[in-house]
Amino acid sequence: MAENWVNRSERIGRDLHLELSGPGSRRAVLIRALRDAVRSGQLAPDTRLPPYRSLAADLGLARNTVADAYAELVAEGWLTARQGSGTRVARRAAPPRPVRVPKKAPAGPPQPTHNLRQGQPDAASFPRGAWLTAGRRALNAAPNDAFGPGDPRGRHELRRALADYLARSRGVRTDPERIVVCSGFAPALRLLFGGVLRGPLAVESYGLDFHRRLLAAASVRTVPVGVDEHGARTEELTAHKQVRTVLLTPAHQFPTGGPLLPERRAEVVDWARARGALVLEDDYDGEFRYDRQPVGAVQGLDPERVVYIGSVSKSLSPAIRLGWMVLPDHLVDPVLAVKGEREAWAGVLDQLTLADFIDSGAYDRHLRRMRQRYRDRRDRLTAALAERAPHIRATGVAAGLHAVLELPPGTEQSTLKAATWQGLAVDGLAEFRHPQATTPRADGLVVGFGTPPDHAYGAALDALCRALPPG
């Protein structure tokens, strides 16, 4: 008996939508739907269809109805059926899809061939084997409670490993109970200003633009503090009477590259003590110093006045969403209260893997390898500039994964356009300047040297030198 069978649609196969509607018997409707799915390309050639029983259960049909529909489509050549391989879409069942000829676009700059943007590590150097080994060990050793709800601070194994590592390598004074694991620097900043701290916040006049966007989204007003070759001009903080928090990159000021002078480190801590304020220490590029030992963390001068924030986004990969905050005692509970309400916790397996990776010494070995690799990259950049553009000065090259190339006044925008035509993705210095900064504007390029693959790095440097203004 014919019937109108509508408002019925289900999923079959590999997430392909099968629409069962229209007049006719259930067998006829199913045959038509399968034929249309093959004809339109929804069911690709050689796709294996579900067994009769499974599809019948999914669609609320009799098994014989599905079997008859399959048999009919096999006879028509839409499907094939073989013992042991099930029922599949015939390889020549569907007509070829029409090829769309794109309209010719107007001539423009080429797509970037070389990525020289800052802030990105060498993805090809991720220690896959060592990370996999650490993950297997960590998973085998994980206690049952690791697969439960967990501690909002993060796994104790990782917090203990971080406390030991940070004390040894960065001079951080802490214990595991004052470390809160999060999923990176940006989530840490959201937590702190999502209900724990209030603005206005002093920031460096040149800094990461996404920090400012994130803070603006949280309705936090930022006040710029000048920077020079020695980091932030901390003496300017006293002029901002309402400011109770300052965000700094003391290990390697971003983007200018200068480490904060020892006397300025002491000065900012004295300011925080006198005003009852806090220093947020972004340990940007703290692991990658080439010409001498990495400078110690400001947090070591006063753990009750400094929030130390770090992550593995540069040392390992931004794909591993792990970071940490080392908090003063009085902030631990407020941060945990906000974290429990607002932020998804970092993955337990990644936490356990990183703990093993640190404890086994694999993290130290990886960092030593990467320091040498990035030092070599830096040296090739400075050598290319010395040979082909000696009038261009590179600054901030003692640490980190980028350099600032100082350009003649008024040439930044034209150089960026030339770089685009050379197939380069690179940032201008103006992008990182605070809108209310009062320090003089400077023209420059912020050139990352961590990302290009080895085989293409020479070509990237050639393209960069061609884009620079003549001397």
Give the ranges of each region predicted by the language model.
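Conserved core of the PLP fold type I
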Residues: 135, 145-275, 287-289, 293-301, ...
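Flexible, Gly/Pro-enriched loop and linker segments at secondary-structure and domain junctions
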Residues: 305, 426-428
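Residue-level detector of anion-binding/catalytic polar loops
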Residues: 221, 278, 424-425
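Short glycine-rich anion-binding loops that position phosphate/pyrophosphate groups of nucleotides
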Residues: 119-121, 250-254, 314, 452
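N-terminal basic, amphipathic alpha-helical segments
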Residues: 1-138, 147, 336, 340-346, ...
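Active-site PLP attachment segment
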Residues: 84, 302-334, 345-349
